[in-house]
Each structure stands twice: as C-alpha cells, then as structure tokens.
C-alpha cells in the first residue's frame, strides 16, 4: 500500500477541484496512482477533469518560423523567466528555429548543424557561459506541404516569432495564397485557444479513447443504467468528446453560429478558389510535461540550522 502524502492530495485537489477528503480517499482506493484516482473521482461524478492540468514547469521560449510551405516550432528552456527576456537568448531561439527549418526536427541534427564557425550545440554552450544559466533545446517539430502553406501563431510574443505558446498549422491547397494565409492565421489562433489533441478521431491515442469509454460506462453502471442503454449513451458521449478534442470537429472560435472547423474550412474554399486540406498542426506550450521542482524555504532553513 502506497503512502498517501499531503502533497499528493494537494496535487489531486488542484487538478480536479474536489475536496481534500474525497481526494485522499481516491488516492487510497487506487494505491497512490494519480491518473487512476482522477478516473475514480470522475466515475463517482465528483470531477470533470480528464487529465492533470498541464502546469508550466520550465522557463524559456517557444520559437515559431515559417517559409511558405514549411514551418517549425522549437522549445528552448532556461532556468528563469528573466533569461527569456534577454535579447541574446531570444536571438539564440530564433537562430535554432532557422536551423530547424533547414535540417528538420531531429535534435541531434540541429545541435550538430553548423552556425558560423561552430555548431548550434556550441552556440548554446556559449550562451550558458555568458548568461550564467543552464539552457537546453528540448524539442522541435516541422510541418511541410507540397502545395499551399504552413501558418503560425505565437501567443503573447515577447519578441517577433517567440513567446510562451506557439502553433503551426499545415494547409494543402492550390488556391489563393492571401486568403489561405488568413485562414491559416485563424486556425493557428484557434489551436492555441482550444488546444485540440488530434486532427480527427482516428488520430487520438486508442488507449486514451478506451479509458474515456470505460470511465463513461462505469459512471452509468453505478447509476443503475441497463447495459443496452449504457452502450448508446457511451456512443453519444464519445461524439461529444471528439467535438471537444479533435480540431476538425471543434466549434470554430471565429464563427458565432457554431460551425465546426471542418465546416469553416469547407466554406473558405469558395474564397480560396480551390479545395483545402488541413494536413496537420503542432501546438507547443512552454514547459508542458516537465515537473517543476519546488522547495519549502522554512524546511531548508531548519535543515541548515540542524533543527527538525
């Protein structure tokens, strides 16, 4: 049996908004497994949280760069937000994005790529020595189309093409570039706001979909619903779920009448003058998935002074 700590209960409460005692029971019932505890609370109807909220746990910048039919996102982490406002660091992020646009998303290739008389890896090391903080190229993504364009958007940019959140969206089309670019900008902003998990249902992780179905089914079983009815309810529930997490099925944030993104794209074909296919998107939020180390200052002082 796992030990349930106050920190675990606090994390679950912050994630789900459920009371402390219910969170403690959920963790106890599931041997300290955070995801299982979240699902347990959802089955009890106590939480609507689908997963632990992605808390920004690292500083730095997301860099976005496009060149007609190709676009790239990079994440470069630093230790403090202060460094993210440093012009040298901002220049480093832009340089890395330019390199990634040429060599692709493989981090080893980016780090080994030549920059002047040295390499990207050396440029990062030099910046660390000059600025005095550890920095790392965490990830990169590239989208490309044969015909059309890749659009980008950086939310709350601290400098041109770099900020805390970046998006690229790929549009395949032979239509008017200016109209396509306008649509691409709107789609990029939509992705930044709505945070879809996949382009369409087929692109979702099967394990995630299976877990979603299990949570819904168990919830209605506990309510005493007959199995035949549960199957239909879950089927309808999945349709709603897809509208929440799949880009093409989401309600387009720029349409007041509630059209889906797919419908908005289809409608835009008239303005563009050719068919449009959204072939992919990438959304990077700074620090997502990185656990941030925290410290108890009072405990550190007590430890340093030999107190318990």
UniProtKB/Swiss-Prot annotation:
Region (Involved in Mg(2+) ion dislocation from EF-Tu): 80-83
Subcellular location: Cytoplasm
GO molecular function terms listed in the Swiss-Prot or TrEMBL record: translation elongation factor activity
InterPro entries xref list: EF-Ts_dimer_sf, Transl_elong_EFTs/EF1B, Transl_elong_EFTs/EF1B_dimer, Transl_elong_Ts_CS, UBA-like_sf
Keywords of the record: Cytoplasm, Elongation factor, Protein biosynthesis
Main subcellular localisation: cytoplasm
Matches recorded under Pfam families: EF_TS
GO cellular component term of the entry, any: cytoplasm
NCBIfam families (UniProt xref): tsf (TIGR00116)
Its biological purpose: Associates with the EF-Tu.GDP complex and induces the exchange of GDP to GTP. It remains bound to the aminoacyl-tRNA.EF-Tu.GTP complex up to the GTP hydrolysis stage on the ribosome.
Family: Belongs to the EF-Ts family.
Protein's name according to its UniProt entry: Elongation factor Ts
Organism from which the protein derives: Rhodopseudomonas palustris (strain BisB18)
Lineage: Bacteria, Pseudomonadati, Pseudomonadota, Alphaproteobacteria, Hyphomicrobiales
Chain's gene name: tsf
